[in-house]
A protein has these predicted regions:
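Iron-sulfur-associated redox domains of electron-transfer enzymes in respiratory
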Residues: 1-180
Length: 180
């Protein structure tokens, strides 16, 4: 998602498109903008949510296999997102089922699984790799910081530290940045 949103932001910036570019992987927020502020939709990122992108990747990677795709998500609004017609390819949903983390937790408890007693294991390849951008992605302002870091590319560690310290992440106040 960060790679796509960074490229989209740079394209908008370089083409003189109207800014700011709004982004959210929250389907509730997207639906709110669609219904209450439709005039802002041209400024909303066209990138899919991580769930949508993973669903598309799975469908493409395993297109010749009978795969049932399940996403584990923190919010029930993701169930709505998965049911949107835009999240279908060739008449099939990109994600077949969404379980909330609460539902999964209940299932684990009912099955009597004790993670502390399970043997250690490594993530599956090739999708078990992760980046620092993904770590900050899930906090308020994390996507913005990850996009800034990506756009800056090979910036010095001091520059990246300055970005982290300037308060992109967090709930305090409105954040404003000049991009040149």
């Amino acid at each position: 998602t960060i790679m796509e949103e960074s490229a989209e932001f740079m394209e908008k910036l370089n083409s003189g498109a109207k800014l700011p570019m709004f982004t959210s992987c929250c389907p509730g927020w997207i639906q709110h903008v669609e219904k209450v502020h439709p005039h802002l939709m041209p400024q909303v990122s066209t990138c899919g949510s991580p769930m949508e992108m993973m669903g598309a990747l799975i469908r493409n990677q395993f297109k010749n296999e009978d795969v049932y795709s399940v996403a584990i998500m923190p919010c029930t609004a993701k169930k709505f997102e998965a049911s949107r017609p835009e999240l279908e390819k060739d008449g099939k949903r990109l994600v077949d089922l969404v379980l909330t983390t609460q539902e999964l937790g209940r299932m684990i408890k009912e099955a009597g699984i004790d993670f502390a007693k399970l043997p250690d294991s490594k993530p599956d390849s090739p999708l078990g790799d992760y980046t620092g951008a993904g770590v900050i992605f899930g906090v308020t302002g994390g996507v913005t910081e990850a996009v800034i870091r990506r756009v800056l590319g090979d910036a010095s560690p001091d520059t990246l530290q300055t970005i982290a310290e300037c308060g992109v992440r967090g709930l305090d106040g409105i954040k404003a940045f000049d991009v040149s």
